[in-house]
Amino acid sequence: MKRREFVQTASFAAVGLLSLPSFLAAGKGQKGLGLQLYTLRDTIGKDPKGVLQKVASFGYKELETYSYNNGQIFGLEFAEFCKYVKGLGMNVTSGHYGLNMIKGDTWQKAVDDAKKNGQEFMVVPYINEPERKSIDDYKKICADLNKAGEVCNKSGIRFGYHNHAFEFDKLDDQIPFDVMLKELEHKNVGMEMDIFWVVNAGYDPLKYFAQYPGRFEQWHIKDMDKEDKNRNANVGTGAIDFKPIFAAAKKSGMKRWYVEQETYPGQPIDSAEACAKYLKTIL
């Protein structure tokens, strides 16, 4: 995972809301703290059940996974993993899937597995550099994402795309992220905004919520080190003020959010705990 810049004015008409899949329009609310398990990538593959026990003890209730592959995750059957998560009082509500997975039978199987285990969102989190050399490259990817979203819609799952920084580096005097917002059909693809990377690029998430209301259905929450903007801080100790951001959740369209740390001031598991403690004080 990596990231960077954008801005543009757009309106989100009421007719657009009416065209959304009913499962999204209904909008089940988040039931507790969320965590993207990539935060614990150094340990979860070695001891998934032990790590999940600690995560549950911190008060997390909703999890976003990564690394699913052909019915397996972290060395376990995906169904077994989800059952264990539920036994700890948590749920897998979202997952990250590689761009190379969204075509063909592998995608349908992933969607079927997600559906069977009660997952609500499936997200593509990254575009490899060789695949994004031009605006035309982005447009082609958006076409693929729209098709993947159609498959998800048929199973009652919401499909999304997660931003990094590179989408905001201009190509041909255009900002790729703006292009994506135009090319992606909202009925098929929602956005998972990584708050950190928007701020890292020098932009204000609140402005994007105002310019594209209803488009940012999931968030990643991580704070920015006050001395080095490319490093994470435990949420609540860095440069980002999350109170006004959460206050704008309805305008943004947010349904789910997840703490995600890519770098740490200490041990990853300690960061997961510290972030949970802070977020409990403001939510």
Name these PLM-found stretches.
Residues 4-16, 22-34, 40-58, 172-193, ...:
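Histidine-acidic metal/acid-base catalytic patches
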Residues 38-40, 66-70, 97-100, 127-129, ...:
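Active-site beta-loop-alpha junctions enriched in small/polar residues
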Residues 29-34, 40-41, 63, 73-86, ...:
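Accessory recognition modules or surfaces
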Residues 10-11, 17, 21, 62, ...:
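Active-site acidic/histidine proton-transfer and metal-coordination neighborhood
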Residues 62-64, 75-76, 82-84, 94, ...:
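Mature catalytic domains of secreted/periplasmic carbohydrate-active enzymes
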Residues 52-57, 73-92, 108-119, 143-154, ...:
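Acidic (Asp/Glu)-rich catalytic clusters
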Residues 34-46, 96-103, 135:
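Active-site mouth loops of central-metabolism enzymes
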